[in-house]
């Protein structure tokens, strides 16, 4: 799969950059108004009662700020955050080591929590409910179970696939918050804030232009800003103007709706070879040279979100909006 400027996933280098941009409290966090308002109440209530915050599940598409919100929860509660991920916890012993190292009140953040296997989930259940850990010592007939007390802690889980969580795990979270895509106004504010952190001068119009092409995702907005900054430094006087931003984004092949060359290839392939569909997923896969699961999990969600694709029982179909976007005449439908 080609690397994409508009991908909502972060690589390891980008994760380091994101840490430097991360707001430290709810007041600094832009967007997700309802989620913030509810978390404010839950955090303040827990602090007033001098209790740990209830376990929190953050879910929604990648790149919307789940990790950032987890760190803010820890900051607002005045505690440390320990970070791990579902794939990194391979054995129950791995989870036991993490849990026994927690201090009272700590936040344990598990990213991609839907990827925990069942045996690890079973260790997690009593830890979440009763703050205890059941450990089996020995093997065979002489094996015995020992219960260890754990300090009270808050588990913050993050997932892009909430439907893959088992019901017993999902039901143990007291706070469930869905993160939504951001508005252009919110993304414009995020671009301006990031530019301030980078000490880059940017006008309102180019900040809006970058926001418009960011697919509703702060991670994409910040990535595009970094690339536009490169063009401003090399081709201009380091100030990001509307002209510089427009020229840079065109060179980067990110169009006015945030579609890149791969989106164009997929959509135009469906139009030119299959008259817009319906087309089966395997056929699209063979046409553009990508795995079916990559198309379904990576490319399709945004196209579905903006109404450019429809899933039907007979296959994928491009909508009239695609023809309008590419300035093509839509074929007559039966």
From Swiss-Prot:
<feature type="binding site">
    <location>
        <position position="63"/>
    </location>
    <ligand>
        <name>ATP</name>
    </ligand>
</feature>
<feature type="binding site">
    <location>
        <begin position="129"/>
        <end position="131"/>
    </location>
    <ligand>
        <name>ATP</name>
    </ligand>
</feature>
<feature type="region of interest" description="Small ATPAse domain (RuvB-S)">
    <location>
        <begin position="183"/>
        <end position="253"/>
    </location>
</feature>
<dbReference type="GO" id="GO:0006281">
    <property type="term" value="P:DNA repair"/>
</dbReference>
<feature type="binding site">
    <location>
        <position position="21"/>
    </location>
    <ligand>
        <name>ATP</name>
    </ligand>
</feature>
<dbReference type="InterPro" id="IPR004605">
    <property type="entry name" value="DNA_helicase_Holl-junc_RuvB"/>
</dbReference>
<dbReference type="GO" id="GO:0005524">
    <property type="term" value="F:ATP binding"/>
</dbReference>
<keyword id="KW-0378">Hydrolase</keyword>
<dbReference type="GO" id="GO:0006310">
    <property type="term" value="P:DNA recombination"/>
</dbReference>
<keyword id="KW-0234">DNA repair</keyword>
<dbReference type="Pfam" id="PF05491">
    <property type="entry name" value="RuvB_C"/>
</dbReference>
<keyword id="KW-0963">Cytoplasm</keyword>
<feature type="binding site">
    <location>
        <position position="311"/>
    </location>
    <ligand>
        <name>DNA</name>
    </ligand>
</feature>
<dbReference type="InterPro" id="IPR008823">
    <property type="entry name" value="RuvB_C"/>
</dbReference>
<feature type="region of interest" description="Large ATPase domain (RuvB-L)">
    <location>
        <begin position="1"/>
        <end position="182"/>
    </location>
</feature>
<dbReference type="InterPro" id="IPR027417">
    <property type="entry name" value="P-loop_NTPase"/>
</dbReference>
<dbReference type="GO" id="GO:0048476">
    <property type="term" value="C:Holliday junction resolvase complex"/>
</dbReference>
<feature type="binding site">
    <location>
        <position position="219"/>
    </location>
    <ligand>
        <name>ATP</name>
    </ligand>
</feature>
<dbReference type="InterPro" id="IPR041445">
    <property type="entry name" value="AAA_lid_4"/>
</dbReference>
<dbReference type="GO" id="GO:0009378">
    <property type="term" value="F:four-way junction helicase activity"/>
</dbReference>
<comment type="function">
    <text>The RuvA-RuvB-RuvC complex processes Holliday junction (HJ) DNA during genetic recombination and DNA repair, while the RuvA-RuvB complex plays an important role in the rescue of blocked DNA replication forks via replication fork reversal (RFR). RuvA specifically binds to HJ cruciform DNA, conferring on it an open structure. The RuvB hexamer acts as an ATP-dependent pump, pulling dsDNA into and through the RuvAB complex. RuvB forms 2 homohexamers on either side of HJ DNA bound by 1 or 2 RuvA tetramers; 4 subunits per hexamer contact DNA at a time.</text>
</comment>
<feature type="binding site">
    <location>
        <position position="68"/>
    </location>
    <ligand>
        <name>ATP</name>
    </ligand>
</feature>
<feature type="binding site">
    <location>
        <position position="22"/>
    </location>
    <ligand>
        <name>ATP</name>
    </ligand>
</feature>
<comment type="subunit">
    <text>Homohexamer. Forms an RuvA(8)-RuvB(12)-Holliday junction (HJ) complex. HJ DNA is sandwiched between 2 RuvA tetramers; dsDNA enters through RuvA and exits via RuvB. An RuvB hexamer assembles on each DNA strand where it exits the tetramer. Each RuvB hexamer is contacted by two RuvA subunits (via domain III) on 2 adjacent RuvB subunits; this complex drives branch migration. In the full resolvosome a probable DNA-RuvA(4)-RuvB(12)-RuvC(2) complex forms which resolves the HJ.</text>
</comment>
<protein>
    <recommendedName>
        <fullName>Holliday junction branch migration complex subunit RuvB</fullName>
        <ecNumber>3.6.4.-</ecNumber>
    </recommendedName>
</protein>
<dbReference type="Pfam" id="PF17864">
    <property type="entry name" value="AAA_lid_4"/>
</dbReference>
<comment type="similarity">
    <text>Belongs to the RuvB family.</text>
</comment>
<feature type="binding site">
    <location>
        <position position="316"/>
    </location>
    <ligand>
        <name>DNA</name>
    </ligand>
</feature>
<dbReference type="Pfam" id="PF05496">
    <property type="entry name" value="RuvB_N"/>
</dbReference>
<feature type="binding site">
    <location>
        <position position="182"/>
    </location>
    <ligand>
        <name>ATP</name>
    </ligand>
</feature>
<keyword id="KW-0067">ATP-binding</keyword>
<feature type="binding site">
    <location>
        <position position="67"/>
    </location>
    <ligand>
        <name>Mg(2+)</name>
    </ligand>
</feature>
<dbReference type="InterPro" id="IPR008824">
    <property type="entry name" value="RuvB-like_N"/>
</dbReference>
<feature type="region of interest" description="Head domain (RuvB-H)">
    <location>
        <begin position="256"/>
        <end position="334"/>
    </location>
</feature>
<dbReference type="InterPro" id="IPR036390">
    <property type="entry name" value="WH_DNA-bd_sf"/>
</dbReference>
<feature type="binding site">
    <location>
        <position position="67"/>
    </location>
    <ligand>
        <name>ATP</name>
    </ligand>
</feature>
<feature type="binding site">
    <location>
        <position position="172"/>
    </location>
    <ligand>
        <name>ATP</name>
    </ligand>
</feature>
<dbReference type="GO" id="GO:0005737">
    <property type="term" value="C:cytoplasm"/>
</dbReference>
<dbReference type="GO" id="GO:0016887">
    <property type="term" value="F:ATP hydrolysis activity"/>
</dbReference>
<dbReference type="InterPro" id="IPR036388">
    <property type="entry name" value="WH-like_DNA-bd_sf"/>
</dbReference>
<keyword id="KW-0233">DNA recombination</keyword>
<dbReference type="InterPro" id="IPR003593">
    <property type="entry name" value="AAA+_ATPase"/>
</dbReference>
């Amino acid at each position: 799969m080609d690397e994409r400027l508009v991908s909502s996933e972060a690589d390891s280098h980008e994760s380091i950059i994101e840490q430097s941009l991360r707001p430290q409290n709810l007041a600094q966090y832009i967007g997700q108004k309802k989620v913030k308002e509810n978390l404010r109440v839950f955090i303040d209530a827990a602090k007033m009662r001098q209790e740990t915050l209830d376990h929190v599940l953050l879910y929604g598409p990648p790149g919307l700020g789940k990790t950032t919100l987890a760190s803010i929860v820890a900051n607002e509660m005045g505690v440390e955050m320990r970070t791990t991920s579902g794939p990194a916890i391979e054995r129950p012993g791995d989870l036991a080591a993490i849990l026994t190292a927690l201090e009272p009140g700590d936040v344990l953040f598990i990213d991609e929590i839907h990827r925990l296997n069942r045996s690890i989930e079973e260790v997690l259940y009593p830890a979440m409910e009763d703050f205890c850990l059941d450990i089996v010592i020995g093997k065979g007939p002489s094996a015995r179970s020992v219960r260890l007390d754990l300090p009270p802690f808050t588990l913050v889980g993050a997932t892009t696939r909430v439907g893959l969580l088992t019901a017993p795990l999902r039901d143990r979270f007291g706070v469930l918050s869905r993160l939504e895509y951001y508005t252009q106004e919110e993304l414009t504010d995020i671009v301006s804030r990031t530019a301030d952190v980078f000490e880059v001068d940017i006008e309102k119009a180019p900040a809006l232009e970058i926001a418009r092409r960011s697919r509703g995702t702060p991670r994409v907005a910040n990535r595009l800003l970094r690339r536009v900054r490169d063009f401003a430094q090399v081709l201009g006087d380091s100030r990001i103007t509307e002209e510089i931003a427009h020229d840079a984004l065109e060179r980067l092949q990110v169009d006015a709706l945030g579609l890149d060359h791969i989106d164009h290839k997929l959509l135009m392939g469906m139009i030119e070879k299959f008259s817009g569909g319906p087309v089966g997923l395997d056929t699209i896969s063979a046409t553009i040279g990508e795995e079916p699961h990559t198309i379904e999990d990576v490319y399709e969600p945004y196209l579905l979100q903006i109404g450019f694709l429809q899933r039907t029982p007979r296959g994928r179909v491009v909508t009239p909006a695609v023809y309008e976007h590419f300035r093509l005449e839509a074929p007559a439908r039966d």
